[in-house]
Amino acid sequence: MTKNYLFLLLGLLLAACSSDDKDEQPILVTNVVMPASGTVFKPGEKVTIMAKGFQDNDEIMFDIRWPLQDEVLHEGYAKGGRGVITEKTATSITFLAPGHWPASTTEILLCRSGQMMSLGKISVADGQAPKDFQLYGIINSRSNTDRPYAIEYINLEKPQTVEIVRLADNQDFSCVVNLPGSWSLSGVWTQDNRRTTGLYDLSMNYWEKTGADQLVTMGIATGNSVFGVYQGGDRLFVKTVNVMPYTRMYIPEKPDYGFLLPEGMKAEVLSRYPCIQMSDGNILCSADNGDGTFSPVVLNGQNMEEKSIYVGEPIQAVALIPFWIVKPVEGMGTAKYTRVGGYIVSKRNGATAEEGDGTEFRLWNPATKTLDEPFTTFSNAACSVATLVSEDFKKQELYVLFDGSRNGRLIYVYDLLKGSWESLYPGGGFPYSEI
């Protein structure tokens, strides 16, 4: 159903930008000069086409084709994606080569007021997302380092990190979530005291900053989508975020989920960590009370007609981080899994003889609205977490960023199936505040 729906959207988009005369293509520009033959563009690389007659409202669309090793279907294709235009004059148009697709021959279509003209074709290199799990580190205003704010790639095979993009002095990127397969990072983009949705496209290497102001935090929904939690007056609204800006497809927004804030609660207390959605529809958030305590906060998403916010008892802690894992559905063995949520409760950085480890990993019990007993602990205080669950469920891991005693922070991996911890890099030394 999902694939059919997307193809329908693409078809409607193309229909809206096609000539009424099927036999004759309109001449929208003249004297077209394409890039040199044989040039292969990287995804996100600037492409300039020269011609006479470009107009301010012109748009670029793509017809992307790539070969398939298939006896029936010899060619894969994607139609209808809109280009990211970076510069436009009366005699030239510059846009970013499309990403996220296999190496392709891409036809460039000029779209104007319901008419479409082919400008020519270019070759584009492979821009597909890696199949393996990818981990990224975020240096932002919460990082205890003098290094510039940036996004870095963390190599999981050997001790190596690579800077992906650096932020300007007046920019910040926080509450970052990574939807598997999208090859993009979504988070809260802060600039000039405005908090909006920021998305960094890892295939095309560019920023997309869209959405309304008053963004509180971000989260990943159970239906493989990203959502933002926005403030509107005395309510919180949950809105789906399009993590495929490179397609420029119109995807209708789902109805807003309006949650009335409890009396005395300000939305900004929920802005410390990303939130997560469980299979029951509820959304787990964390409230920083500003007095050395945190409170579990649950947005009740089970009944959209009676939306409510539950606030748990304050917990003395330095961190209360929502996380998710999967568990087998009762009575079905490992045939079916459900997503459950919980909180990482960090009371201090380090273990004590009297109280034990400083951090506990505890699942949330929706029935009792309390935290279960810890299923694992760690001595250091946690800062951030990322969950890996493979498609066959044979690999289930938590990647956790911990405070260190010196030389930066540590990343440890908890194997949920084996119940064991392992250091990602011996010695640590990471400058991140989020992973």
Go through the PLM ranges and name each one.
Residues 13-16:
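C-terminal motif of bacterial Sec signal peptides marking the signal peptidase cleavage site
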Residues 18-59, 68-79, 115-129:
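Beta-strand/beta-sandwich contexts
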Residues 77-82, 86, 122-165:
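An edge-strand/N-cap motif at the start of beta-rich repeat modules
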Residues 143-153, 192-199, 234-248, 290-298, ...:
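Structural motif
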Residues 160-168, 205-212, 216, 248-267, ...:
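A short beta-strand motif characteristic of beta-propeller blades
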Residues 403-435:
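Blade-level signature of beta-propeller repeat domains, shared across WD40, Kelch, NHL, RCC1
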